[in-house]
Amino acid sequence: MKRVAFIIHRYGSEISGGAEFHCRALAEALQGSFEVTVLTTCATDHLSWKNVLDPGRTYLNGVCVMRFPSIQERDLEAFHEIYDQIFQTQLSAEREQELLRRQGPYCPDLIEYVRTHAADYDAFVVFTCIYYPALQVIPLVGGRVILVPTAHDEQSLYLHILDELIPRVRTIFFNSEEERQLVQKRFALASTFGEVVGVGLSAPQDVQPDPAWVETASRLKGTPLLTFVGRVE
């Protein structure tokens, strides 16, 4: 059975976040067809990267999860001191690296694990192209990386360090056609490079409708509705 490692900055059933949910859904769907291991941090908060969960190996819904500590919490003031400069000038390579460390999660033990165990895995599914773990892993195993960039048209996407790394991955899984166009244009990639994959959904089995909702739906029939889809954290 082929072995696949997922790289994600946070992971867990208690964590809300688009990339985090996507990673967990995909890892759980592939478990059984592949031997899946998730490499992540001990953080639950993406603002501070504070170590909350225990380091080491655990299992969640049958998926092996290996957690590594962040060795520094994020200093938002120091981070924005550098980040805000992106809007005014091109940062040097050294300042970009410093920005990535300050953005975090700064987890060199995770990177060292990939370096020393790279041969143990057939593929690496790497999430979110602007975080430290992703950008450190790609140079080590780029030819086996399936990148899920979860890219937005934001200033971080225009860091020069990305120009060297994104073209080195094996392929890219996009969440939408718009994201595909954004990334392909930004990095001058061939239109055939990467696929729009999105996030799979499993239909619930044997779910009985809530009688209260049936009554409400009947009462509101023909009434214009506004639906909000998002997350609360």
Residue ranges of each PLM-predicted region?
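A conserved catalytic-core segment of Leloir-type glycosyltransferases
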Residues: 41-119
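Conserved donor-binding/catalytic core segment of Leloir-type glycosyltransferases
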Residues: 5, 201, 213-233
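Membrane-proximal helix-turn-helix segments that form the acceptor-binding/catalytic region
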Residues: 115-116, 133-134, 139-140, 150-174, ...
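Short beta-strand->alpha-helix junction loop in the catalytic core
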Residues: 152-153, 178-179, 196-207
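Short hydrophobic "strand-cap" motifs at the C-terminus of beta-strands
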Residues: 7-10, 148, 175, 197-200, ...
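An aromatic- and histidine-rich active-site surface loop
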Residues: 99-113, 121-141, 154
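N-terminal subdomain of nucleotide-sugar transferases
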Residues: 1-69, 119
